[in-house]
Amino acid sequence: MPNLLSIENLSWQVFDKTILNNISFNVARGEVLGIIGPNGAGKTSLLRCITHQNSHVRGNKLSGVVTLENRIISQYSAKELAQHFALVAQKTEAIFSLNVYDIVSMGLLPPKPLFSMDSTADKNNISKALEVVGLSHALSQSFNDLSGGEQQRVLIARALVQGSQILVLDEPTNHLDVYYQHQILRLVTSLQLTVIMTVHDLNLASQYCHRLLLLNKGALVCDGPPEKVLTSELLSNI
């Protein structure tokens, strides 16, 4: 599979604190890449660098190169980045008691004012995304009335309507019970997109990811298939 994303010698410091230290890896088109490691290892920080969300952090010192389709990430506009990356952050509460349709519509590109009239094409796009995540029946329900697994599927549907080629998820199964953890990851890995996600549960990482990056203290300890990374020898040193 050809590389879609390339990270070379990436380091990130904020003031005098090292967040990431000399990380290099590639992501192939269509790959499901899991990022694992203990709390504070730099997993979410790495996602922020990949998606160019850390450029305005105070005290920021960033070195190395991130390229997307052979183009340096800093050369992309915010609009172009949204066309390439769809981000599902760790589960957050809705600011307003919006219904499912309104939340999913927030993913439309270009962004539209909330409660504005959507075109027929937009409505079809939203309906298709909800169908993919199995929530066609819930479009008028309040987000806050849904289960944790259903809420996460709504956020994935919102990402899908962007039409981006890379789905980036930060702990997509956080705070979900075992049934919904598997439901979400089966969904994510069936979408035929390039997927980059942080994963806390090593069993889930082994089952659903093509490849794993093991981080510790901001450094890349191991990069490879789950059977290479998830060894007792490696994990005992973390």
Regions found by a protein language model. Give the residues of each.
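The feature captures the beta-strand-to-loop junction immediately N-terminal to the Walker
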Residues: 36-38
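Helix-to-loop junction immediately C-terminal to a conserved catalytic motif
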Residues: 51
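ABC ATPase NBD Q-loop/coupling interface
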Residues: 65-80
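Conserved ABC ATPase "signature" region
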Residues: 105, 120-138
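Conserved ABC ATPase signature
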Residues: 142-146, 150
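Catalytic Walker B motif of ABC-type/P-loop ATPase nucleotide-binding domains
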Residues: 167-171
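Conserved ABC ATPase "signature" C-loop
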Residues: 217-218
